[in-house]
Amino acid sequence: MNSNTTPRVARRITSPAVAPPGIPLPTDDAPIPAHRYYTPPPRPLASCERQRSGEAPALALTTDTSFHNIVTMTSGHGGVGLSVMASMLAWTLARREHSCALIDADFVAGCLDLLLGVEREPGLRFSQVDAPLGRIEGDAMNHELMMWEGVRVLPYDPWSARQPDWWEVQAAIRALAETNDVVIVDAGQGGLIETVPDLRSGMQVIAAELSVMGLARAKSHRSRLDSWGCEAPHIVGVEPRGAPRGRSHVGIGEAQDYLTATVLGPVKPSVNLCGDVLEGLGIRSVLLITQYNPCSGKCATSHSGLDELQAAYLSSLWEA
C-alpha cells in the first residue's frame, strides 16, 4: 500500500435485530423518544392563547363550595358607585363587629386602595398572590393584608403586568372566607364570575343606576348572571349624579316594574364624598359623620340602601 492508496476501513457488520412477533421494528427516520423521569412543565401561554370566559376549564365548572359568607357585587356598567357601595357595606358590617375582608376583583379598573386612600399602606396586592397548588393559608394571608377602618383589603393594581389566573382568585377568596365572617368582592362588571365558582355561588348584589339606560343595562346584566347559574340577585337602585336640574330620575316603583324584581334604595349621591374621591382623599366625608350617604361617579351609598342591604345579607346568613 502506497501513499495514494485509500486505506481500507474495517466495517462492522451486525445482524438485523429480530423483534418479537407482532411488534414492528422502528424505522430509521422515526424519532426516538427521549427518556424522561419527570413531567415537563407546561409551556406558558401567551395572552392571546389563554382561555376566556367561554372556555373555562372543566374544573372551574365542577368545583363545589360550602362557603355562605361571600357577597359578590357587580353592576351592568362602570361609574355607578359600586366600589364605594362595596366598601361602605364592608365598613358598616365591621362596625357591627363582623370580621370583614374586601376584595378588589375588578381587573379592568381596580385601584380600590386608591379609592379608599390607603394606596401608600404596606400590604399584599392581587398581583402578588401566588397559589401554584390552588391553595392559600387563610390566617397567613389575613396578616398580610392592609387595613382600612377595621376592614381587611385585598386591592388590585391594574398597572401591574401580571393578572391573576382564575384559580388564584378562587384560592384567595376561599382563604379569606375561611378566616373572616364576611367576604365582600367588588367584581366590577362580572368578568370573572363565570370562571370562578365561589363568585357564582355567593350572594349576588347588583348596583343599578336609576335611569332608562342604567336599568336597561342592569336587566341585561341580570340575564347574564342567570345564564351562569347565579342565585337571584339583590338589586340596589342608585340615583344618577349630575342630572340636570328639574329632571328627575326613575323612581323605585318604576324600576321594580321594569325589572320585575324588588329594588332596594335609593342610594343618593353625595357631593362632598364625590369631591374627596376625585381629589384622591379617600372615603373620609362619610366616616366623619354619623348619617353617611356615599356616592357619585365611582361612588354611591345611602343610609336607606345600606340598611336594607345589610338586613338582606344577615337574613341570608341566618337561613344558611
Regions found by a protein language model. Name each.
Residues M73, P155-D157, I184-D186, V205-L210, ...:
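Conserved beta-strand segments of the P-loop GTPase G domain that flank and frequently precede/overlap
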Residues M1-I70, E119-E137, S223-G237, G253-Y258, ...:
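Acidic-aromatic/histidine active-site loop/patch
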Residues R135-W148, R152-G190, T195:
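Cytosolic-facing regulatory segments adjacent to core modules
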Residues E178, G191-V212:
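Inter-motif core of Ras-like GTPase G domains
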Residues E239-G242, I252-R284:
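Beta-strand-loop-alpha "switch" segments that mediate conformational coupling across diverse proteins
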Residues D64-L116, L176:
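Walker A/P-loop phosphate-binding motif and the immediately C-terminal alpha-helix
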Residues V182, G202-Q204, H234, A261, ...:
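Well-ordered beta-strand positions
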Residues L93-R152:
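Phosphate-binding loop that captures ATP/GTP phosphates
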